[in-house]
A protein has these predicted regions:
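Short, glycine-/small- and polar/acidic-enriched structural segments
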Residues: 1-131, 136-140, 155-161, 176, ...
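Pocket-lining segment of extracytoplasmic ligand-binding domains
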Residues: 62, 136-137, 142-218
Length: 218
């Protein structure tokens, strides 16, 4: 049987769809099996997609921008609703920093190619600064990011929901800035162009099931 290899991250619509088993049922009449591959972040997922290790996946809009800029040849198929407040940068509650300008020359935790990095670049540009004006500390997982924050080894950390909301509850922190006015922070679904062209019937079923799941999860 043919297989669709889907990359997903936790706490996302694809992850919920995986849990329901509905996609497997919907694709069975087409003789398609589903293989699920979990990734820690959208950056790694997009790299796997570009390398041909998976066929279909999702990531935040910032990651898609980086991938397109690098000429990796991914095609956007659909986008979920904007969620600019779902990505942001935290500082300690008693921190003297009041805006992104105050991070000049400071160590800031973000993921390489993540929506947090894209948001940081946009925030710095909006403040008349460049990415080179901060010292980025690249961290892969949300838990390591929170650990760096708690250790005080960075001035600010970039996180995305549900980790952003969770960290605000678990740590003595406040949001210095989020994606509002800087990035839509949509979740995009994309594939390799050749896969999308050859498998429109399969992708139609995938999106029908995603739409049902999205309606249910909201």
């Amino acid at each position: 049987p043919k297989v669709i290899r889907i990359g997903y991250q936790k706490f996302n619509t694809l992850n919920i769809l995986k849990g329901t088993g509905n996609l497997e049922k919907a694709l069975a009449p087409l003789g398609i099996k589903v293989e699920w591959h979990e990734f820690l972040g959208g950056g790694q997922l997009a790299e796997a997609l570009a390398a041909g290790a998976i066929d279909f996946g999702h990531a935040a809009d910032g990651i898609g921008v980086f991938q397109q800029a690098s000429g990796k040849g991914l095609v956007y198929l659909a986008a979920e609703s904007p969620y600019p407040g779902g990505v942001g940068f935290l500082v300690p509650k008693d921190s003297p920093y009041q805006s992104v300008r105050d991070l000049k020359g400071k160590r800031v935790a973000t993921g390489r190619g993540y929506n947090t990095q894209y948001t940081l670049i946009r925030a710095l540009e909006a403040a008349g600064l460049q990415y080179e004006d901060v010292e980025p500390v690249y961290i892969v997982t949300a838990s390591d990011t929170v650990a760096a924050f708690q250790a005080g080894s960075v001035a600010a950390v970039g996180l995305w929901d549900p980790f952003l909301a969770g960290a605000q509850v678990a740590t003595n922190s406040r949001v210095l800035f989020d994606g509002k006015g800087l990035t839509a922070n949509r979740t995009y679904h994309f594939a390799k162009p050749e896969y999308a062209r050859a498998n429109q019937d399969v992708l139609k079923v995938v999106f029908a099931e995603l739409q049902k799941t999205n309606g249910w999860s909201q």
